[in-house]
Amino acid sequence: MKTIKSNIVKAALGLAVVVSPTFFSSCDDMLDLVPQGTFTDAQLDSTTIEGLLTSAYAGLECHFFGNNESFQGPITNWIFDVRSDDAYKGGGSLSMESNIHDLEVSNLRSDNVCVRDKWRNNFYAIDRVHKAMRAIEGSNVANRESMLGELKTLRAYFYFDLIRVFKNIPYFDETVDDPSSVSPYQYSRDDIFGFIKQDLREAYLAMPEKQQDKGRFNKYVAAAVMAKVCAFTASVNNSQQDWNDVVTYADYVIGSGQYELYPNFLDMSKVEFDNTYESILAIQFAATADNAHYNYPNMLNCTISEGNLYGNGDDFFLGSQNLVNAFRTNDAGLPYLSGNSGDVDNNVNVTGDYQGNVDPRLDFTVGRIGFPFRGHTYTSSWCRAYDIYGEYSGKKGQLAPEDPNMVPGIVPWGASGLNFCLIRYADILLLKAEALIETNKDLGKARELINDVRDKAKRSIDGAYSPVDLDPMRASYKVEPYPAEGWTQDYARRAVRMERRLELAMEGNRWFDLVRWGTVVDVVNKYMQNESSLRTYYEGASMSDDDVYFPIPLDEVDNAANGTYDEPKQ
């Protein structure tokens, strides 16, 4: 069966004509995206149209300039987990990737390259979408409306990613001839969320239930993105209607019968399970001969290893001690719900020799000294800067070195063709559960959905499942479903927030959950204060309300007309 992944590879090898060369050279002003590379009617054949569509999908890779820009401003949003209480920057020193270090300690500046790269990666991706839209709108290609639905879903996702990160952004569609004329303050945030939702409504109606190519968007991808968007606006605006919409669109996904939870938690880190089970919206990475489409955003986040077993690794993106502690469970197999946002007290630290109960998802998420790591034994010598960042190298997104989907000859060793799920089925189940809890409509159903996710974790306790990633003989794994007794709205809210933290840990969700819940400043400040006793680089670090959203990149302000923008729309 064809996949959109194979189409992306073919487009890169044989359809370079579909993207204008000026697209790659015009880097000075990310708002200066005047339409380039128009096509004549004779050029608009089905092959060219497919190439443009595929190029738009490839925008999810965020590989427009080079590997550094993909790493520093990825749509995987790992750098935002570093901004939260879930992760440390990692690497060999504090100064290595210093711009990400600044984000970790909340030293937020408009000239930070992560701010710049996040902005321009998304806007260049949107430009690709608009190129494809203009071509398709002017053609008579078969499945025209469905293709436009795919592109509207992509555009909605890119704008959603931007509006979650930046407080003010310019919004323009494919009909705008000169995007540089659009001020970041022309539309309010509510306006932009409205545009995003309208794209997704239209996309849902236009796309089929199934696509021939695996990984290509169907109507349920649009529904899943809509559920994510509505959960954000529901939380921020305390909107009961938006919570109702979360349930509606989550039910579209659930009722489709096309998605289910992975049989084993480890399956999300296996290429053979790409575009199956939980995968709803994924970046389609590939191990190819030209090394053009491997997992640029994550490749540096691989552990170093004893005796160079894995080859050189940069060991960025390590789980925090606070995150690891969150995986503790009590005698009933339930997490310790000490906070209202999945945050925990650091009174007990889980380490490799910890004797208490833990959720098995801990050892699928991070490496622990003495425990299996993709079939090998993880030791302290695998930690590049143990004294600074500790031991908890991330596992999600990393294959075993023997896996045939690794890209050989790349340093560091982490380059592979493993997809990265931006939205997976467990996320949608938990969003529906959260919506039912917030509206107080069906707490029992919410508990059932949360327990479905916990049951997957329980059945994943299999010490023989390959490649081996946990050790039931060494750790006391215990995870159980929530009982009906004591299941109040307040308790259920704390439970679903903790479940999102545990299930989706180090997948780029935690920061945005804290933002939409309105707890990010309190949670991160408490976290930084606790961390300062363990890691001196947190001493004096703090976050204010002004630090939540990225500022407009300094380059964009400098390049704007007269160096200023119009006053914000209230």
Residues covered by each model-derived region:
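Long, intrinsically disordered, low-complexity segments
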Residues: 33, 87, 93-95, 109, ...
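Conserved, well-structured interaction surfaces
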Residues: 46, 50-54, 58-63, 92-166, ...
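C-terminal substrate/ligand-recognition segments
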Residues: 355-456
